[in-house]
Amino acid sequence: MPATQMMTAEVPGMYRRLASAIGAEHWQGAVARQEEAIRSNHFLGDYLRSEYAIAYQLDRLRGVVARFGTVPYEIYNDPDIFPSLAFTAQVLGVLERSTVKQAKAFVKRVRNAFSRSEELHGLRLELLAATHFARRGQHVAWHRVSNGGTFDLLVEGIGPSGLEVECKSISENKGRRIHRRDALEFWGALWRDVADIAQDLRSGLAVVLTVPYRLPTDVAQRAALAREVVARIVTGSGAALGGGAGVRGCALKSSILQKLK
């Protein structure tokens, strides 16, 4: 059964227990990797900090503990870190009900979650679903703890054999051929050249890039596509590009630009 409530006085001890079980270096490393990516492309900032929000919140606690030796009241009573506190309580709840072997496997999964945002979203969804049923007073068995079944959760007391729950996390990229990070990385590469060009513009310019399926995954091909797009912007004309891609542009009215500010 996952934790469904906590007292603020428990926060410092809970964070220390989580750091001891999982290792603070995992969320510290996750934050460091995102910040490195952001330094190379500032357009990734909002996206990566949102995707790894739990890691950022836990790393904030890590820094506070390193500085003060504990988590001050002003920090653990800040709503901005509540999601990470819920995550902490839920993870510790699973570990408390695990055998040594099961706990070792779960710790590995939590550590891996800080390496990939998709894994972190999936883990949080399972914890959230388990907490939902626990708040309703039902007993929840986690198959990753009991090592039974092919489902994520078993909610006992519903139906003759309980309710099997399979959790599927759906991100904002679901159904999109071009994922947001790919688009932001491509725009970051374009901006290195477009920023200088934009300074000489005397009117607005809207540019639309169309690709047949997805942006190239190969670094060299993506760089070549970026150069072609920049060349079209310089000439101010659209054209069909290699690989089935195409660029078209049109004047953007100043009134529209004012609305975007």
Outline where the language-model segments fall.
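Gly/lys/ser-thr-rich phosphate-binding loops in alpha/beta enzymes
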Residues: M1-R17, T131, W142, G148
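Metal-dependent nuclease catalytic core centered on acidic motifs
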Residues: P2-G13, G23, D46, P72-E96, ...
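Interdomain/boundary linker segments immediately adjacent to catalytic/signaling cores
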Residues: A21, H26-L123
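Enriched - but not universal
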Residues: G29-E35, V145, L190, V194
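Acidic-basic catalytic patches of nuclease active cores, encompassing PD-(D/E)XK
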Residues: V107-A141, W191-T210
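Short acidic/polar capping segments at secondary-structure boundaries
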Residues: E119, R144-G148, I170-E172
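Conserved catalytic cores of phosphodiester-cleaving nucleases, focusing on short active-site segments
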Residues: F133, L153-V155, S161-S169
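A short acidic/basic microdomain associated with nuclease active sites
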Residues: R135-E156
